[in-house]
């Protein structure tokens, strides 16, 4: 048995009908190498079958066109075996013929048309409107089963071309670290208004070169005729010992206003011109200046108010009232802003101390004499009466000397006292109280 075909005549051979099973035939010949490739005519004579013109394997051709066996058949064999072999070969070839016919059916060669020979459609010849920048074709109209249909090329006439710059951004053969200060394109001349002229294009920022800050210069003089130019009082400024215990700012403001009105009514003089006599110990009062000269007068700001050459101001620490003047008991005379012309008044202070000591000693002696007078009878009464009269004489003598020691209320310069020393007005008041409390 070669290639699956039996050659022994003794084995029964089954007759295959023309309805040969394609599956069985394919199983028999699938193991062999290329089967019949050549064409076999469809019509074949009944008795004979032409040899297969195949280009396949040589053993397959010999088996299909096999010669009769070497040993002759016995005379007892049926003569019908020979035609059965032929029928088998024809039936086998028929099955193969039908199979090869299906597999090797030549395709009808369709003449392919070149793209230039395609029928022109009216939609392709339409011009693209200038308002549209998209291509004229639409993908939704094309059919997916027509591979021979190509997309229409867009019309490049309506595509804008960018102008090439005259100069590149970076020059060739140049270091990248160096900045390129050259412009990409040449500057165009633009008509711009003059920025120096007032125009809407002019910037509103101030020019620092034209505007310069003025130098700060101190004021050397002030107009005294202006009521608003009232100098700051010296008492407001804290001295070496701190701010002085004076009345509140409202009272001082009212005092300054009243003083300014008085000075204005008297042509900027501290006192009326009737009192031309000067008190002892004070500088002479300058002569009155005319009104026209006082209006044009200019006084430097840094002039001290206690300077004797200043005609319009006097020391702030001097009071017209002696009671208020006695309350100034802080610091030395020089530290309180007093004028050096008031320093000779220290002799008056020493006299006040002597009077105070004598008054205290006399008061003690008179108290002892009064106790002795109460122990005695008539003699004690007369002695107490005489002692009381003697005490009254001393008080009257002190009261007579009091106005001489203390300055009058109308005087300009009233003395100030150091801390720890009694003032002259207080001493006089104490003497009056002692005289009033003594039994008559």
From Swiss-Prot:
Compositional bias per record (Basic and acidic residues), positions renumbered to this chain: 249-266
Protein name listed in UniProt: Uncharacterized 48 kDa protein
Polar residues bias: start-end ranges: 55-80
Compositional bias of kind Low complexity: 274-284
Pfam families with a match to the protein in the record: Tymo_45kd_70kd (PF03251)
Organism (species): Erysimum latent virus
Sequence intervals crossing the membrane: none
Region named Disordered: 49-81, 162-295
Entry similarity comment: Belongs to the tymoviridae protein p69 family.
Domain of life of the native organism: Viruses
């Amino acid at each position: 048995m070669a290639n699956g075909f039996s050659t022994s005549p003794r084995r029964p051979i089954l007759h295959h009908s023309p309805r040969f099973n394609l599956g069985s035939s394919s199983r028999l010949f699938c193991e062999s190498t290329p089967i019949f490739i050549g064409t076999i005519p469809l019509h074949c004579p009944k008795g004979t079958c032409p040899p297969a013109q195949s280009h396949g394997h040589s053993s397959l051709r010999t088996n299909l066109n096999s010669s009769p066996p070497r040993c002759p058949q016995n005379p007892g064999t049926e003569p019908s075996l020979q035609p059965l072999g032929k029928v088998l070969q024809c039936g086998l070839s028929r099955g193969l013929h039908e199979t090869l016919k299906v597999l090797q059916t030549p395709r009808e060669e369709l003449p392919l048309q070149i793209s230039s020979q395609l029928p022109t459609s009216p939609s392709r010849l339409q011009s693209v409107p200038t308002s549209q920048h998209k291509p004229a074709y639409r993908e939704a109209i094309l059919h997916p089963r027509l591979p021979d249909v190509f997309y229409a090329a867009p019309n490049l006439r309506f595509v804008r071309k960018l102008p090439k710059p005259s100069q590149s951004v970076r020059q060739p053969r140049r270091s990248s670290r160096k900045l390129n200060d050259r412009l990409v394109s040449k500057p165009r001349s633009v008509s711009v208004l003059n920025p120096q002229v007032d125009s809407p294009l002019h910037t509103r920022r101030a020019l620092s070169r034209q505007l310069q800050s003025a130098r700060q210069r101190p004021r050397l003089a002030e107009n005294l005729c202006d009521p608003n130019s009232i100098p700051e009082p010296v008492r407001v400024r804290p001295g070496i010992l701190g701010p002085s215990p004076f009345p509140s700012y409202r009272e001082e403001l009212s005092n300054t206003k009243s003083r300014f009105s008085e000075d204005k009514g008297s042509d900027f003089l501290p006192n009326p011109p009737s009192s031309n006599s000067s008190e002892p110990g004070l500088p002479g009062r300058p002569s009155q200046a005319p009104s026209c000269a006082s209006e044009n007068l200019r006084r430097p700001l840094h002039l001290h108010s206690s300077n004797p050459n200043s005609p319009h101001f006097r020391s702030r620490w001097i009071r017209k009232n002696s009671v208020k003047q006695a309350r100034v008991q802080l610091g030395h005379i020089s530290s309180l802003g007093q004028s050096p012309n008031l320093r000779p008044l220290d002799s008056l202070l020493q006299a006040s101390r002597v009077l105070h000591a004598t008054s205290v000693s006399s008061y003690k002696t008179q108290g002892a004499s009064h106790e002795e007078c109460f122990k005695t009878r008539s003699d004690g009464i007369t002695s107490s009466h005489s002692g009381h009269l003697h005490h009254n004489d001393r008080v009257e003598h002190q009261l007579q000397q009091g106005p001489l020691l203390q300055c009058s209320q109308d005087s300009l310069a009233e003395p100030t006292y150091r801390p720890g020393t009694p003032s002259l007005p207080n001493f006089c008041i104490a003497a009056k109280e002692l005289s009033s409390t003594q039994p008559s």
